[in-house]
Amino acid sequence: MIRTRYRIDGSGARWVTFVTGIANDLTMWDGQVPALERDFRILRYDLRGHGGSEAMRGDYSVSLLVEDLLALLNQLRVQTTSLVGLGLGGAIAQAFAIEHPERVEALMPCCCRARMVPDFAAMWQKLRATVQQEGLEAIVEPTVQRWFSEEFKAAHPEVLEKIRKMIRRTTLEGYMGVTAAFLGLDLEDRLPEIRARTLYVSGAEDKLGGPPELMKGLSEKVNGAKHVSVPKAAHIANIQNPEGFNQLLTDFLRRKQ
């Protein structure tokens, strides 16, 4: 078992667990904690090789990242939790809900996919090659530029600088490992197995990570699932429009089955 950095906030009885994406760490969810801490116990953690979590060499898989989450929940004796994940974190959350339905109270995959496709894979193969040849610093700026809308980038340079620092906390092993997992993503045919109450959330201006039309299609494969789009937000919707995202988040999580 790897050493995993995690943080618990809040004083409520029900758990909600946030799952990060590629080159993110648990600080990406800082803007969501105040909206939930009165009513929920909030668990955030770093994927292996990201932030403060231990890295291992070699390719990772989505199944391995699901096992990491299961091990953490077991260690903390969290029997059931709602899951919120963004990007690769959304894929991990979907996979966890498929493999461990008894542990998931509600599911909110954000700005994500359930299957890798050739054109998207080509972009990630190019990013991996750049990192291998030039190091992680070479993809920091292209990543920041891809994650947010032009309007947001112009108005919030201080947020972009925080994001750059977050990306730089990712290890080379962690980046290569989780991108390999992402390239192997193939969950779409199993989405009908999801039993948890599910809300798919996209950023209205997300063109690549989890475009609204793609996420609407995913929601149609899960019994009873819905899709909503956060206005004025691109890929990292929870940071670009925290008010809009948090309204959807709190409305969804506070409803019980």
Where are these regions (language model features)?
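Conserved HGGG/HGGXW glycine-rich cap/lid loop of the alpha/beta-hydrolase fold
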Residues: 8-58
